Amino acid sequence: MNRLSTFDNRKNLILSTLFIAIFAQIQTAWIADDAAITLRTIDNLLHGYGPVFNIGERVQAYTHPLWFMLLSGASLLIGNIIVTAYLVPLLLSLTNLWLFLKFIPKNSITGVLGVVPLLLSASYLDYSTSGLENPLSHFLILLSAVAAYSIHEKNEYKPTTIFLLGSLLYLTRPDLIIAIIPIAAIVVHQNNYSRSELATSLTIGSIPAVAWTLFSIYYYGFPFPNTAYAKLGNGIPIMERMGQGLIYIIDSAIRDPVTLGSILTALTISLRAKLMERGLALGILLYLLFIVSIGGDFMSGRFLTAPLLFSAIIITKSNPDTDRYKSILLLLLILGGMSLKNTITKSSEFSIKDILTTGIADERRFYASKTGLAHVGRDFFRLSKTTHTTRAVEVTCGGLGFSGLRGGPNLHLIDYCGLADPLLARLPAKYDERWRIGHFSRQLPENYEASILEKKNLLSDPEAIKIYDSLTIITKLPLNTPGRLKEIIKMNLVANNNKLDRYRFDAIPQDSETPAILYEQQGAPEVQSSADTHNSSNFSKSMDIVLRKSLILQSMGFLSMTNNVYLISMYFNGVLIPLKEIRSTEKTENGYFIYQFKPDQPLKVPTDRIRITAPDGSGQYILKNFEVKEKDSWQ
């Protein structure tokens, strides 16, 4: 009778948990821009262009091969990549909750302790959808835990199972291998496997990871994602990164107390727990140390969902007495209540003020009104149907994924953060004392945009020319081109020389010519969010503003996304006359910096052309809302 009652209680817990989760996840389902980078690659694959972000350029712009393959297969069956990006994470996240409650707790009572933080954590709920790989990571973590406990307690599986799951986890989120090493080591050490048995198990288990790595080297030319090379080249000192990493942890504690609170609770419990729980706790600590060492992430809480899941397992396995049970449950409920405002009750309204000086953002809140399932219309599900009819090239960083989906396959996006660009990923990041984690901009070599558009090497820098030629052979020429393997070996084994350091510290001219725009006084666009670059003007070094009529310039103003120094000059009788350097003194709510120009002395000669020059800065500039007046009235 007791066994039947226990079964009924567990069944009721599972059903009630899934019911709550379905409501919460449908309400909060969204798609992140980083996920849209993967979706564009899938879209290109399904349309016959190959698994590439920009057609004709073999670059792995996604970090999660197994997630990419899962979404690609599902998109092929479903027929719509956007529907797939909502549906697959939702189904997988519900499966994870069922798997957790079915196999982890000893009974329904301890199951409640584990499921409370998973339901109330803003981070866990946000990234149970999002289109990112978190749900698949959670699935493989749970399978690894189930397998490890089965081997540890019942010796039901061979170590091959753990190694195979680790291999699949590597293909989903490579750094999570760190977190499961301790429990894998416990399983191996406890059972005294022979060397030959371990070697056989390791060989079989590593087949998926090795097979993918060999394919990646052959197809893309490199063993790791392009994103890894872009982020490894950031040049940020380790102590600065660790400082930012600690801020990332603190940010989570403020925004989402139940996540960090549950992790700390689990680590405390593990001090008196059994061997496997101590192994899980060690995995949490190692992974947290890794997170801190890389500077965390710009998406608040994203990297803490795996440690939270490990913590839920530890809490569930703790089997506390009645008093401790009540104390732990009360603590989790209080912390969960504090986090509740950031879960299903969270507003979808977002201001750029929410991105603190730390550069960490509530990413779902930013995208909720744009990609949230509760907010999107039918047109959103037809994103990839909108295409450029002719080939075009644009330079961008933020909003890379959705810009690519909206632009279609004929739009080549140069990602100056390097995530999707093979050359820029291998150049040093531009030095910026106000760096933001995950957004390390590069300076484009001179004439790089023209080289992409014309499909030939027009660069002027000898060092960049060499790298670009090698990358052209690796990423653009046919796979079996003679000499391609040699270039792959050279690019992977030979380090770049110090002559490229000037891309980090110097101001590099990006174009041989200065672009010009015609100034239209009427209908100046209103400022939108900092991620919206529509109705704006981009330039890399300087830009000319052509006036419809000559006037005596008394004042001028514009908005810029970056707080740089700009030199204002004007043409008079064909001669460029420098006037004044200006710096921003104010920032709008939407994150733009306001620039106002007034000459030190009243000008007495007219001009019909004004030049804005950035003597130094990021190498990529976006200006909006030009206003030129003959009276000193710009606001």
Where are these regions (language model features)?
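Transmembrane-helix motifs of polytopic, lipid-linked glycan transferases
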Residues: 87-108, 143, 147
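Loop-to-helix entry region of an early transmembrane alpha helix in multi-pass inner-membrane enzymes
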Residues: 55-61, 65, 69, 76-98, ...
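Membrane-interface alpha helices of multi-pass inner-membrane proteins
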Residues: 20-24, 114-120, 142-143, 159-173, ...
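Hydrophobic, aromatic-rich transmembrane alpha-helices
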Residues: 2, 97-101, 181-189, 251-288, ...
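Short acidic/glycine- and proline-prone juxtamembrane loop motifs at membrane-interface regions
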Residues: 31-32, 129-136, 301
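C-terminal luminal/periplasmic domains and tails of membrane-associated envelope-modifying transferases
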Residues: 364-635
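Membrane-interface transmembrane helices that cradle and orient dolichyl/undecaprenyl
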Residues: 105-106, 144-161, 188-192, 272-273, ...
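Hydrophobic/aromatic-rich transmembrane helices and adjacent perimembrane loops
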Residues: 128, 174, 178, 250-255, ...
